Amino acid sequence: SCRYFLAEWGRKEIELAENEMPGLISCRRNMRFKPLRVQIAGCLHMTIQTAVLIETLVELGAEVTWSSCNIFSTQDHAAAAIAASGISVFAWKGETEEEYLWCIETQLTSFKDGKHLNMILDDGGDVTSLVHNKYPDYLKNCKGISEETTTGVHQFYKMLKEGKLKVPAINVNDSVTKSKFDNLYGVSLVLIYKIISNIKLRCRESLIDGIKRATDIMIAAKVAIVAGFGDVGKGCAKALRGMGARVIITEIDPIVALQASMEGYQVAVMEEVADQADIFVTATGCKDIICERHFEAMKNDAIICNIGHFDVEIDVAWLIKKCSSISNIKPQVDRYLLGNGRNIILLAEGRLVNLGCATGHSSMVMSMSFTNQVLAQIALWTAQEGQYPLGVHFLPKKLDEEVARLHLSKLGKLTSLTPEQSAYLDIPIDGPYKSEHYRY
Protein backbone atom coordinates (compact mmCIF):
# COMPACT_ATOMS: atom_id res chain seq x y z
CA SER A 1 0.00 0.00 0.00
CA CYS A 2 0.98 3.67 -0.31
CA ARG A 3 1.25 3.99 3.48
CA TYR A 4 3.60 1.01 3.67
CA PHE A 5 5.72 2.41 0.84
CA LEU A 6 5.98 5.79 2.58
CA ALA A 7 6.95 4.18 5.88
CA GLU A 8 9.58 1.97 4.24
CA TRP A 9 11.01 4.93 2.32
CA GLY A 10 11.08 7.01 5.48
CA ARG A 11 12.82 4.26 7.44
CA LYS A 12 15.60 4.02 4.86
CA GLU A 13 16.18 7.78 4.99
CA ILE A 14 16.13 7.78 8.80
CA GLU A 15 18.84 5.12 8.86
CA LEU A 16 20.90 7.18 6.42
CA ALA A 17 20.41 10.38 8.45
CA GLU A 18 21.63 8.66 11.62
CA ASN A 19 25.10 8.47 10.07
CA GLU A 20 25.18 12.30 10.02
CA MET A 21 23.72 12.83 13.50
CA PRO A 22 26.47 11.74 15.89
CA GLY A 23 25.23 13.83 18.81
CA LEU A 24 21.87 12.10 19.01
CA ILE A 25 23.37 8.66 18.48
CA SER A 26 25.87 9.35 21.28
CA CYS A 27 22.97 10.28 23.58
CA ARG A 28 21.39 6.90 22.90
CA ARG A 29 24.67 5.07 23.47
CA ASN A 30 25.72 6.95 26.60
CA MET A 31 22.36 7.21 28.39
CA ARG A 32 21.09 3.65 28.52
CA PHE A 33 19.75 4.30 32.04
CA LYS A 34 16.80 6.09 30.37
CA PRO A 35 16.76 9.48 32.11
CA LEU A 36 13.58 10.63 30.33
CA ARG A 37 10.76 8.46 31.68
CA VAL A 38 8.30 11.20 30.86
CA GLN A 39 5.45 12.24 28.55
CA ILE A 40 6.69 14.78 25.98
CA ALA A 41 4.44 16.80 23.66
CA GLY A 42 6.63 17.82 20.72
CA CYS A 43 5.78 20.37 18.04
CA LEU A 44 8.59 20.72 15.52
CA HIS A 45 8.94 20.27 11.75
CA MET A 46 8.20 16.57 11.07
CA THR A 47 11.25 15.81 8.93
CA ILE A 48 13.63 12.87 8.61
CA GLN A 49 16.02 14.58 11.03
CA THR A 50 13.21 15.14 13.52
CA ALA A 51 12.39 11.44 13.28
CA VAL A 52 15.91 10.70 14.58
CA LEU A 53 15.25 13.12 17.47
CA ILE A 54 11.92 11.48 18.28
CA GLU A 55 13.39 7.99 18.32
CA THR A 56 16.24 9.22 20.50
CA LEU A 57 13.76 10.60 23.04
CA VAL A 58 11.90 7.28 22.99
CA GLU A 59 15.12 5.30 23.50
CA LEU A 60 15.85 7.52 26.50
CA GLY A 61 12.56 6.44 28.05
CA ALA A 62 10.05 9.04 26.87
CA GLU A 63 6.53 8.57 25.57
CA VAL A 64 6.17 11.09 22.77
CA THR A 65 3.30 12.62 20.81
CA TRP A 66 4.22 14.83 17.88
CA SER A 67 2.88 17.48 15.54
CA SER A 68 4.57 19.74 13.01
CA CYS A 69 5.02 23.46 13.68
CA ASN A 70 4.37 24.44 10.04
CA ILE A 71 1.62 23.40 7.63
CA PHE A 72 4.05 22.77 4.76
CA SER A 73 7.14 21.38 6.49
CA THR A 74 6.16 17.77 7.11
CA GLN A 75 7.90 15.09 5.07
CA ASP A 76 5.14 12.51 4.78
CA HIS A 77 7.51 9.56 4.54
CA ALA A 78 9.16 10.64 7.80
CA ALA A 79 5.79 10.90 9.54
CA ALA A 80 4.72 7.52 8.13
CA ALA A 81 7.88 5.83 9.41
CA ILE A 82 7.40 7.25 12.90
CA ALA A 83 3.72 6.28 12.95
CA ALA A 84 4.61 2.75 11.81
CA SER A 85 6.89 2.41 14.83
CA GLY A 86 3.94 3.01 17.15
CA ILE A 87 4.55 6.67 18.02
CA SER A 88 1.60 9.08 17.90
CA VAL A 89 2.28 11.64 15.18
CA PHE A 90 -0.24 14.14 13.80
CA ALA A 91 1.27 15.83 10.77
CA TRP A 92 1.12 15.84 6.99
CA LYS A 93 2.35 18.19 4.29
CA GLY A 94 -0.21 20.76 3.18
CA GLU A 95 -2.40 21.01 6.27
CA THR A 96 -5.03 23.73 6.42
CA GLU A 97 -4.90 26.15 9.35
CA GLU A 98 -7.83 24.27 10.92
CA GLU A 99 -6.09 20.91 10.48
CA TYR A 100 -2.90 22.33 11.94
CA LEU A 101 -4.70 23.42 15.10
CA TRP A 102 -6.46 20.04 15.27
CA CYS A 103 -3.10 18.26 15.10
CA ILE A 104 -1.43 20.16 17.92
CA GLU A 105 -4.57 19.91 20.06
CA THR A 106 -5.13 16.20 19.44
CA GLN A 107 -1.58 15.28 20.37
CA LEU A 108 -2.17 16.62 23.89
CA THR A 109 -4.80 13.94 24.58
CA SER A 110 -3.06 11.05 22.83
CA PHE A 111 -0.78 9.75 25.56
CA LYS A 112 -1.41 6.19 26.71
CA ASP A 113 -3.72 5.43 29.62
CA GLY A 114 -5.08 8.98 29.66
CA LYS A 115 -1.82 10.48 30.88
CA HIS A 116 -0.99 14.14 30.35
CA LEU A 117 2.23 15.81 29.28
CA ASN A 118 5.10 16.36 31.69
CA MET A 119 7.31 18.25 29.22
CA ILE A 120 6.92 20.36 26.08
CA LEU A 121 9.41 20.46 23.21
CA ASP A 122 8.41 23.41 21.06
CA ASP A 123 9.40 25.26 17.90
CA GLY A 124 7.68 28.62 17.63
CA GLY A 125 5.70 28.39 20.86
CA ASP A 126 2.35 27.20 19.48
CA VAL A 127 1.93 24.23 21.82
CA THR A 128 3.12 26.33 24.75
CA SER A 129 0.54 29.02 23.95
CA LEU A 130 -2.24 26.46 23.45
CA VAL A 131 -1.58 24.76 26.78
CA HIS A 132 -1.25 28.05 28.68
CA ASN A 133 -4.41 29.53 27.16
CA LYS A 134 -6.74 26.54 26.76
CA TYR A 135 -5.41 23.68 28.90
CA PRO A 136 -3.80 25.32 31.96
CA ASP A 137 -4.53 22.23 34.08
CA TYR A 138 -1.91 20.35 32.03
CA LEU A 139 0.74 22.68 33.45
CA LYS A 140 0.32 21.27 36.95
CA ASN A 141 2.53 18.29 36.13
CA CYS A 142 4.67 20.02 33.50
CA LYS A 143 8.29 20.48 34.60
CA GLY A 144 9.41 22.60 31.70
CA ILE A 145 9.64 23.60 28.06
CA SER A 146 12.53 23.65 25.61
CA GLU A 147 12.19 26.06 22.67
CA GLU A 148 13.94 25.69 19.32
CA THR A 149 13.66 28.99 17.52
CA THR A 150 14.15 32.74 17.86
CA THR A 151 10.46 33.51 17.41
CA GLY A 152 9.39 31.14 20.17
CA VAL A 153 12.05 32.41 22.56
CA HIS A 154 10.90 35.99 21.97
CA GLN A 155 7.36 34.90 22.80
CA PHE A 156 8.53 33.22 26.02
CA TYR A 157 10.29 36.38 27.21
CA LYS A 158 7.13 38.34 26.45
CA MET A 159 5.00 35.84 28.41
CA LEU A 160 7.45 36.01 31.32
CA LYS A 161 7.35 39.82 31.35
CA GLU A 162 3.54 39.77 31.36
CA GLY A 163 3.38 37.13 34.11
CA LYS A 164 1.84 34.53 31.79
CA LEU A 165 4.64 31.95 31.67
CA LYS A 166 3.84 29.31 34.29
CA VAL A 167 6.70 26.80 33.96
CA PRO A 168 10.47 27.16 33.47
CA ALA A 169 11.80 27.12 29.92
CA ILE A 170 15.18 26.55 28.32
CA ASN A 171 16.17 28.70 25.37
CA VAL A 172 17.78 26.15 23.04
CA ASN A 173 17.93 28.66 20.19
CA ASP A 174 20.72 30.69 21.77
CA SER A 175 22.97 27.77 22.55
CA VAL A 176 26.12 28.43 20.53
CA THR A 177 25.94 25.02 18.88
CA LYS A 178 22.44 25.88 17.68
CA SER A 179 22.50 29.55 16.73
CA LYS A 180 25.98 29.64 15.18
CA PHE A 181 25.51 26.44 13.18
CA ASP A 182 21.84 25.64 12.48
CA ASN A 183 20.76 29.28 12.06
CA LEU A 184 23.86 30.34 10.14
CA TYR A 185 25.06 27.36 8.11
CA GLY A 186 21.80 25.41 7.81
CA VAL A 187 19.67 28.20 6.31
CA SER A 188 22.05 29.37 3.67
CA LEU A 189 22.85 25.90 2.45
CA VAL A 190 19.24 24.90 1.93
CA LEU A 191 18.51 28.09 0.08
CA ILE A 192 21.35 27.42 -2.35
CA TYR A 193 20.57 23.75 -2.78
CA LYS A 194 17.06 24.58 -3.77
CA ILE A 195 18.60 26.77 -6.40
CA ILE A 196 21.09 24.16 -7.67
CA SER A 197 20.26 20.62 -6.80
CA ASN A 198 23.78 19.25 -6.73
CA ILE A 199 25.14 21.59 -4.05
CA LYS A 200 25.10 20.24 -0.50
CA LEU A 201 26.24 23.04 1.77
CA ARG A 202 24.31 23.67 5.37
CA CYS A 203 21.31 27.21 6.95
CA ARG A 204 23.40 28.62 4.06
CA GLU A 205 22.37 25.46 2.23
CA SER A 206 18.65 25.35 2.78
CA LEU A 207 17.73 28.79 1.46
CA ILE A 208 19.35 28.25 -1.92
CA ASP A 209 17.95 24.75 -2.06
CA GLY A 210 14.45 26.12 -1.63
CA ILE A 211 14.77 28.88 -4.22
CA LYS A 212 16.35 26.60 -6.81
CA ARG A 213 13.84 23.79 -6.47
CA ALA A 214 11.00 26.26 -6.70
CA THR A 215 12.14 28.44 -9.59
CA ASP A 216 15.20 26.95 -11.34
CA ILE A 217 16.60 30.46 -11.76
CA MET A 218 20.28 31.29 -12.00
CA ILE A 219 21.34 33.31 -8.97
CA ALA A 220 24.48 34.80 -10.51
CA ALA A 221 24.18 38.47 -11.51
CA LYS A 222 20.81 38.81 -9.76
CA VAL A 223 20.16 41.47 -7.13
CA ALA A 224 18.91 40.01 -3.85
CA ILE A 225 17.58 41.82 -0.80
CA VAL A 226 17.91 40.06 2.56
CA ALA A 227 15.79 41.65 5.28
CA GLY A 228 17.50 41.06 8.61
CA PHE A 229 21.17 40.33 9.30
CA GLY A 230 20.96 38.12 12.36
CA ASP A 231 22.47 34.64 12.24
CA VAL A 232 19.90 33.44 9.70
CA GLY A 233 20.17 36.58 7.59
CA LYS A 234 23.97 36.35 7.64
CA GLY A 235 23.79 32.80 6.34
CA CYS A 236 21.32 33.74 3.62
CA ALA A 237 23.38 36.72 2.48
CA LYS A 238 26.56 34.67 2.36
CA ALA A 239 24.86 31.92 0.37
CA LEU A 240 23.39 34.32 -2.17
CA ARG A 241 26.67 36.15 -2.59
CA GLY A 242 28.44 32.83 -2.96
CA MET A 243 26.12 32.05 -5.87
CA GLY A 244 27.07 35.31 -7.56
CA ALA A 245 24.23 37.60 -6.50
CA ARG A 246 24.68 41.23 -5.50
CA VAL A 247 23.20 41.35 -2.02
CA ILE A 248 21.55 44.30 -0.28
CA ILE A 249 20.77 44.18 3.45
CA THR A 250 17.97 45.93 5.33
CA GLU A 251 18.34 46.05 9.11
CA ILE A 252 17.06 48.00 12.15
CA ASP A 253 19.98 47.32 14.53
CA PRO A 254 22.89 49.75 13.95
CA ILE A 255 25.48 47.29 15.26
CA VAL A 256 24.32 44.50 12.98
CA ALA A 257 23.92 46.91 10.06
CA LEU A 258 27.52 48.03 10.60
CA GLN A 259 28.59 44.38 10.52
CA ALA A 260 26.86 44.01 7.16
CA SER A 261 28.62 47.08 5.82
CA MET A 262 31.99 45.77 6.99
CA GLU A 263 31.25 42.50 5.20
CA GLY A 264 30.91 44.45 1.98
CA TYR A 265 27.13 44.45 1.65
CA GLN A 266 25.12 47.51 0.68
CA VAL A 267 22.86 48.48 3.59
CA ALA A 268 19.70 50.31 2.58
CA VAL A 269 16.01 50.73 3.38
CA MET A 270 13.49 48.56 1.55
CA GLU A 271 11.58 51.48 0.05
CA GLU A 272 14.66 52.77 -1.78
CA VAL A 273 15.80 49.47 -3.32
CA ALA A 274 12.63 47.41 -3.83
CA ASP A 275 12.60 48.35 -7.52
CA GLN A 276 16.13 46.97 -8.01
CA ALA A 277 15.87 43.42 -6.66
CA ASP A 278 15.15 40.13 -8.39
CA ILE A 279 14.98 38.12 -5.16
CA PHE A 280 13.63 39.10 -1.74
CA VAL A 281 14.32 37.06 1.42
CA THR A 282 12.82 38.01 4.80
CA ALA A 283 14.67 36.76 7.88
CA THR A 284 13.60 39.12 10.67
CA GLY A 285 10.94 37.43 12.80
CA CYS A 286 8.95 40.68 12.55
CA LYS A 287 5.70 41.55 10.77
CA ASP A 288 5.07 43.76 7.72
CA ILE A 289 8.58 43.61 6.26
CA ILE A 290 7.31 43.47 2.68
CA CYS A 291 3.95 45.11 2.05
CA GLU A 292 1.92 47.18 -0.43
CA ARG A 293 4.40 49.95 -1.18
CA HIS A 294 7.14 47.41 -1.81
CA PHE A 295 5.05 45.11 -4.02
CA GLU A 296 4.03 47.98 -6.25
CA ALA A 297 7.65 49.03 -6.80
CA MET A 298 8.98 45.56 -7.67
CA LYS A 299 10.19 44.32 -11.02
CA ASN A 300 8.08 41.95 -13.07
CA ASP A 301 8.40 38.38 -11.72
CA ALA A 302 10.36 39.37 -8.64
CA ILE A 303 10.72 36.34 -6.37
CA ILE A 304 9.70 36.73 -2.72
CA CYS A 305 10.30 34.25 0.06
CA ASN A 306 10.48 34.09 3.84
CA ILE A 307 12.80 32.12 6.08
CA GLY A 308 11.52 33.48 9.40
CA HIS A 309 9.36 31.14 11.48
CA PHE A 310 5.89 32.65 10.99
CA ASP A 311 4.10 33.91 7.87
CA VAL A 312 3.79 37.52 9.06
CA GLU A 313 6.82 39.05 7.35
CA ILE A 314 5.21 39.28 3.89
CA ASP A 315 1.75 40.82 3.54
CA VAL A 316 0.25 37.89 1.64
CA ALA A 317 -3.29 39.02 2.49
CA TRP A 318 -2.75 42.22 0.48
CA LEU A 319 -1.46 40.24 -2.49
CA ILE A 320 -4.49 37.97 -2.46
CA LYS A 321 -6.92 40.86 -2.08
CA LYS A 322 -5.41 43.22 -4.63
CA CYS A 323 -4.08 40.94 -7.36
CA SER A 324 -5.93 40.53 -10.65
CA SER A 325 -5.23 36.80 -10.78
CA ILE A 326 -3.23 34.03 -9.10
CA SER A 327 -1.52 31.27 -11.09
CA ASN A 328 -0.20 28.22 -9.29
CA ILE A 329 2.99 27.26 -11.14
CA LYS A 330 3.78 24.21 -9.02
CA PRO A 331 3.27 23.28 -5.35
CA GLN A 332 4.26 26.27 -3.15
CA VAL A 333 5.01 28.51 -6.15
CA ASP A 334 2.32 31.12 -6.95
CA ARG A 335 2.39 33.98 -9.46
CA TYR A 336 0.31 37.04 -8.58
CA LEU A 337 -0.67 39.49 -11.34
CA LEU A 338 -0.90 43.00 -9.89
CA GLY A 339 -3.02 45.86 -11.16
CA ASN A 340 0.07 47.57 -12.59
CA GLY A 341 0.56 44.66 -14.98
CA ARG A 342 3.58 43.21 -13.20
CA ASN A 343 3.77 39.76 -11.61
CA ILE A 344 5.08 38.73 -8.20
CA ILE A 345 6.28 35.16 -7.57
CA LEU A 346 5.64 34.08 -3.97
CA LEU A 347 7.20 30.92 -2.56
CA ALA A 348 5.60 28.69 0.09
CA GLU A 349 2.75 31.19 0.63
CA GLY A 350 5.15 33.36 2.65
CA ARG A 351 6.00 30.56 5.07
CA LEU A 352 9.38 28.92 5.60
CA VAL A 353 10.82 28.50 2.11
CA ASN A 354 13.49 26.01 3.08
CA LEU A 355 10.90 23.56 4.38
CA GLY A 356 7.98 24.48 2.13
CA CYS A 357 9.96 24.24 -1.12
CA ALA A 358 12.77 21.93 0.00
CA THR A 359 13.68 19.52 2.78
CA GLY A 360 15.16 21.89 5.34
CA HIS A 361 18.59 21.81 6.95
CA SER A 362 21.15 19.04 6.66
CA SER A 363 21.31 16.21 9.17
CA MET A 364 24.60 17.31 10.75
CA VAL A 365 23.49 20.81 11.79
CA MET A 366 20.11 19.47 12.94
CA SER A 367 21.93 16.93 15.08
CA MET A 368 23.61 19.85 16.87
CA SER A 369 20.29 21.60 17.49
CA PHE A 370 18.48 18.43 18.50
CA THR A 371 21.22 17.25 20.85
CA ASN A 372 20.71 20.57 22.65
CA GLN A 373 16.98 19.79 22.78
CA VAL A 374 17.62 16.37 24.32
CA LEU A 375 20.00 17.82 26.91
CA ALA A 376 17.50 20.58 27.72
CA GLN A 377 14.70 18.07 28.25
CA ILE A 378 16.92 15.96 30.52
CA ALA A 379 18.12 19.02 32.44
CA LEU A 380 14.59 20.21 33.15
CA TRP A 381 13.15 16.78 33.96
CA THR A 382 15.96 15.71 36.30
CA ALA A 383 16.52 19.12 37.93
CA GLN A 384 16.57 19.40 41.68
CA GLU A 385 13.97 21.62 43.33
CA GLY A 386 14.81 25.26 42.60
CA GLN A 387 17.52 24.51 40.05
CA TYR A 388 15.39 25.97 37.27
CA PRO A 389 13.03 28.56 38.79
CA LEU A 390 10.30 30.14 36.71
CA GLY A 391 12.03 31.94 33.87
CA VAL A 392 13.83 31.44 30.57
CA HIS A 393 17.19 29.71 31.02
CA PHE A 394 20.23 28.66 28.96
CA LEU A 395 22.10 25.39 28.89
CA PRO A 396 25.45 25.76 30.65
CA LYS A 397 28.58 26.36 28.56
CA LYS A 398 29.93 22.93 29.52
CA LEU A 399 27.02 21.19 27.78
CA ASP A 400 27.30 23.48 24.76
CA GLU A 401 30.93 22.47 24.41
CA GLU A 402 30.02 18.81 24.81
CA VAL A 403 27.57 19.07 21.91
CA ALA A 404 30.34 20.52 19.77
CA ARG A 405 32.77 17.83 20.90
CA LEU A 406 30.39 15.03 19.92
CA HIS A 407 30.06 16.41 16.40
CA LEU A 408 33.67 17.40 15.88
CA SER A 409 34.67 13.77 16.36
CA LYS A 410 32.93 13.10 13.04
CA LEU A 411 34.72 15.95 11.26
CA GLY A 412 38.17 16.44 12.75
CA LYS A 413 40.42 16.11 15.79
CA LEU A 414 40.56 18.38 18.82
CA THR A 415 43.78 19.56 20.47
CA SER A 416 43.96 18.98 24.22
CA LEU A 417 45.53 21.27 26.79
CA THR A 418 48.51 19.94 28.71
CA PRO A 419 48.36 20.23 32.51
CA GLU A 420 50.90 23.05 32.30
CA GLN A 421 48.84 24.93 29.70
CA SER A 422 45.70 24.39 31.77
CA ALA A 423 47.40 25.89 34.82
CA TYR A 424 48.82 28.81 32.82
CA LEU A 425 45.43 29.75 31.33
CA ASP A 426 43.49 28.80 34.49
CA ILE A 427 41.15 26.74 32.32
CA PRO A 428 40.14 23.13 33.13
CA ILE A 429 41.56 20.60 30.69
CA ASP A 430 38.01 19.41 29.88
CA GLY A 431 36.48 22.89 29.81
CA PRO A 432 34.49 25.03 29.88
CA TYR A 433 36.94 26.99 27.76
CA LYS A 434 35.06 30.28 27.48
CA SER A 435 33.08 32.41 29.90
CA GLU A 436 29.28 32.38 29.74
CA HIS A 437 29.26 35.84 28.15
CA TYR A 438 31.85 35.05 25.44
CA ARG A 439 30.63 35.93 21.93
CA TYR A 440 31.68 33.44 19.29
Swiss-Prot record:
KW NAD (keyword) present? yes
Q: Which GO terms describe its cellular component?
A: cytosol
Q: What is a biological process (GO) this protein takes part in?
A: S-adenosylmethionine cycle
* Pfam families recorded: AdoHcyase, AdoHcyase_NAD
Supply the alphabetized keyword list.
Hydrolase, NAD, One-carbon metabolism
Q: Which residues form a coiled coil?
A: none
GO MF term set: adenosylhomocysteinase activity
Against SMART domains, the record matches this protein to: AdoHcyase, AdoHcyase_NAD
Q: What class of enzyme is it?
A: hydrolase
CDD domains recorded: SAHH
Q: Which family, according to the similarity comment?
A: Belongs to the adenosylhomocysteinase family.
> What is the protein name given in its UniProt record?
Adenosylhomocysteinase
Give the organism, scientific name.
Answer: Pneumocystis carinii
